[in-house]
Structure formats: C-alpha cells, structure tokens
Amino acid sequence: MFLTSVLILCSLAALSLGQKNNNFAPGRNTIVHLFEWHWDDIANECENFLGPKGFAGVQISPPAENTVIGDRPWWERYQPISYALNTRSGDESALASMIRRCNNAGVRIYVDAVFNHMSATSGIGTGGSSCDVEPSASPAVPYGSGDFHGRCTSNNYQDPNNIRNCWLSGLPDLDQSKDYVRDKILEYLNHLVDLGVAGFRVDAAKHMWPADLQVIYGRVKDLNTDHGFSQGSRPFFYQEVIDLGGEGVSKNEYTGFGTVLEFKYGTELGNAFQGNNALHNLENWGPAWGLLEGTDAVVFIDNHDNQRTGSGAILTYKNPRPYKMAIGFMLAHPYGTTRIMSSFSFDYNDQGPPTQGPGFNSVRNLHQWVGGANTGWRQILRVMVGFRNAVDGTSISNWWSDGNQQIAFGRGDKGFVAFTLAGDINGNLQTSLPAGSYCDIVSGKLENGSCTGKTVNVDGNGQAYITLSSGEDDGFLAIHVGAKV
C-alpha cells in the first residue's frame, strides 16, 4: 500500500512538472502573442519570419466560437458561445493548417483558452450558434443553467469564494467542479491537442479553483507526436492570475501544476524604464522583487488587456523608447519564459482589429499592426529574440551600474548589454567575452562580414569600450558571439 501511494505521488509530481515544460524546439526561447491575427497570416509569419528568426512559439487569440457583438470589439473573442473552432481569425480547417505549418517551421502554437465562463451577451455566434444569457443556456455546447454557479457579482477581491464562484463582469460562471463541465472543457482542449498545439494560456485562471484546474489539466492528453513532440510530452499551461499583492487569491496557489503569468514583472519594469525607479536597483531582479521563481513564471511587458486598461506603470507601443528598452532588458535577462506582444494600433479601448474591406474575412491592414509588418518593431524583436537564443544556458555576469540610470551586464561568455536612461556611457566595461570586434545588433546588423551599426571592440582581458548616448532612439546596445565581425 505504501509503495503504491509513493508511485502515485511520483506520477502526479512528474505530470505537474511536465506541464511547466514549454515544449520549445531546441535553441528557441520566446513566445510572441499575435493578437487577433488571422490563421492564414500566422502560418505565413511562421514560415517567412518567426521560424527563420528563431522565435519559439505563437500565442493565438481564442479559437472558440464567440458571440458577434455590435462594432466587433476585441473582447468579443473572450465571450465564447460554443467550443466550435470558428472565429473571425478563420475556421477549423484554416486553424489546423496553420498549426501544422507553424510546427513544421519550428514554431509552437499556444491557445488562449477561455473556459471560466461563457458569453454575457445573448445572440448569434461567429459560427451561427446561439445562446441566451438569462437562463444561462449555451445550447451549442450544450450547457444549461445547472452547469453554472448561481448569479452573483465578482466584486470582493479579498474573498476567494466571491472571486471564484461569482460572475466576472456579468459573464456566466461555469462550475468546473461538475464532471459534465469538466468533460466538455476537456473535449475542447483535447481536440486542440489532436490538432497539434503545444499548450494553453488559461484565461481568468484566478477565477477558478486551483483544485478543479489541477484535475482538468491532468486529464488533458499528451501532445500529438505527429507534430514533432516527444512521446509523453505534456501540454504547457500558463495561467492568468493577476496578483500584485494584497488580495484573497495568490499566484502561488497555481504553481503546483503549471506556470503563471507574472503581472508584477511588467509593472515593475514599466516603473523602472519610465525613470520612476533607478535602473541600478535591477541588479537583483527576480524573486527578491516579489516575483515567482523563474521556472514558474511567464513574463511580459504588456498584454492585450493592460495595453488598454493598465495603470501608468504599463509600457506599450505608445511609449516607444522605454517600451523597447524594457523589452530589450526582458529578452537579455535569464528570468522566466518570455512573451512579447504583436498587437494593432488603437484609438479607443474597445476597438477591434483593422481590416481592408467591409468584413472580418478581408485582408488585414498591415500598417495598423504593431510588431508584425512594422519593420522598426521587427528589428528590435528579431535581434533580441536572437540574442536570447545566443546566450541560452548562461547566467548574469559582470553587472555594472553608475549607481543611477545606467546599467550593463553580461551573459557569461556569450553576450553583453548596456542601457542608459540618463547621461552617456563612454568607457571600458568588463565582459567575459572572447577578444574581438562585435556588431551592436540594436543599431545595425552583421551583413557580409561587416556591421551596419556600431562596432564594439573587446580586448584580451574582456574589456569592451562602450559608447551609448542617452539621446539614441533605442537606449541600449547588445552584442553576442553570434554577431562577431
């Protein structure tokens, strides 16, 4: 009996640990969220840019059918009406094709999975299904009123029962303790695993009981080996648990069976790179700041929600210089699994994605997309994703600061970065890099053996002469062994 119990516990521990494995292909380290992109466009991006440039994965918008709402706001994607795979991003056939093409390009797909709730808006869905909020009925699943928690408003963030059993923003709250509800959620998740996805961002995980989620995750299938995953590989789960401290639900409740989106990360870096906290304080960046252990955390500067509704601490594409610097720091630092944002420009918070033409099946307007077709953003994202890949497996070394708003650090003998928010850096800094000339990948690129930007010389003692002006557009430089002149 004792041996059986031990074996069961070991099996559960292995299962939970596997759900923290991001399933990246070797040599790749960063997820990009292609928010509201069409499936066909994502497939092309995987083949033509993300795969060749070393990106590890794509987080896609919710693929489940949602209610069609008024002016088609972005948030209608978070109002599921069924688990049919039919949205304005494309149908199931297009989704399946995209997943296969991206996997073939070495880029994994992570689904934004919404199963805390169903739609708060009665009406017709993107695939023609219907729902009625008043009796809490989603006949296309089907769910009936008995599958939901009783109506109450989620408004007391000191009370875990209120947070997890009441309706968030009027959204009918599913009861994940019920076997039937679990089974319907599992049908949805397992179908996506069959199609070849590598994992899930779990929307509103904070509003579901950890014990229920642990059961659901544990019953999701192993990943599909037809898509290049090793036998027995588990889906990667990263959970939306907004925890900035002082509430009744803690992010630590969710780390036993998956990773967690670390919201404190972007808030603190946003403050730092806007000059509200001196950069030199980042020397001990990580759990000492109240962050999760790095193996438990998926980190980001901004997301689709707080781009629009976040505090002044949140950096977005609308604050280009500090935003790029914060992204650069995130991708240069070894902490956490990194995720970057590719969104669209917007003038008001509810604004949906751009198109050319009268319907959402028309070709998207590339000029309104940020981090995709916009070549300036592609440059920063591409080179720093490449930097992270080049320095993988190394730790922080040779930390330097001026005691205020200038910092620099190495990644072992593989790379080195420097940042300034105030004043110029002109002088020798210690690195662990081999002697030679290196191309600053932020100001230029290595092309036919020459650097189109700054060249940084490292002597035989590892000393690098760094010149970085506080007036430069990007505010930082980066060199690594893969960009040696």
From Swiss-Prot:
InterPro entries: A-amylase/branching_C, A-amylase_C, Alpha_amylase, Glyco_hydro_13_cat_dom, Glyco_hydro_b, Glycoside_hydrolase_SF. Ca(2+) binds at N116, R164, D173, H207. Its cofactor is Ca(2+); chloride. Expressed in larval and adult gut. Keywords: Calcium, Carbohydrate metabolism, Chloride, Digestion, Disulfide bond, Glycoprotein, Glycosidase, Hydrolase, Metal-binding, Pyrrolidone carboxylic acid, Secreted, Signal. The modification Pyrrolidone carboxylic acid is found at Q19. The record marks D305 as: Transition state stabilizer. It holds the Pfam family Alpha-amylase_C. Glycans are attached at N448. Its EC number is 3.2.1.1. GO terms for cellular component: extracellular region. The active site is at D203 (nucleophile), E240 (proton donor). It is found in: Secreted. Residues 1-18 form the signal peptide. Disulfide bonds join C46-C102, C152-C166, C439-C451. It catalyses: Endohydrolysis of (1->4)-alpha-D-glucosidic linkages in polysaccharides containing three or more (1->4)-alpha-linked D-glucose units. Its main location: secreted. Chloride binds at R201, N303, R339. Gene3D superfamilies: Glycosidases, Golgi alpha-mannosidase II. One of its GO terms (biological process) is digestion. GO terms for molecular function: alpha-amylase activity; metal ion binding. Belongs to the glycosyl hydrolase 13 family. Monomer. This is Alpha-amylase.
